[in-house]
Amino acid sequence: MNKIRPIHLRRSWLFVGAATENHIDEANESSADVCIQEFEDFCVPERREFARKIMPEVIATWKKRGKVAAVRINPLEDPDGIKDLRAAISANVDTVLLPKANYPYQIDKLINCVTELEKEFGKEINSTEIVPNIEQAIGLENALSILEKKQRVVASLVASEDMSVSLKSPRNKTSKILNY
C-alpha cells in the first residue's frame, strides 16, 4: 500500500464536484484528510470528460499537499463508471469509492477491474484502496459480505440521507433516525 494516512486517522472526508474547479481549488487549501473528486452525484454527465482530463493534476496536487487522494466513480453498471475508474487508476489515485454498493459481486467486479488497470498502468498491485458507499437498505443487509473483501476494502461509508429514503424513515427536525 501507499504511505498514506492510515484509515483510522482519516477524520475528515471532503467531497467536491469532479469538474467544479473553484471547489477543487478550495479543497486544495482545506484541512481535510481525504479529498474526493466526486463523479456520481456532483458532476453532470456533460462535464465528466473534462473532469477526467483534469484528474491527474487534481490527484497530484492533493497528494503533494499530504491528502489522501480519492475518486468516487459512477457505478460500474453505468458506462461512465469504467471510464472514471480507468482515469483514476492512470492518475495514481489512492482510494476509489464505489456508490450504490449493494451486493458483494459489485465489489468483486471492482476489485478485478482495479487489478487489471493497475497491471496495465504499471501501478503496484493491491495499492489502490476501495471504499464501498452503502446507500440503500439492501446494501446495509449485505454489508458484512461486502466488507469481507479484505484485501482491498479499507472502510465503508453509509450515505445517511439516501439510506433514510431507502428505509422510508420519517425526516423532520426532531428525527433521531440518523443517530443510529
Name the predicted role of every residue range.
Residues 1-180:
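Expand to "…catalyze enediolate/carbanion chemistry for C-C bond making/breaking, isomerization
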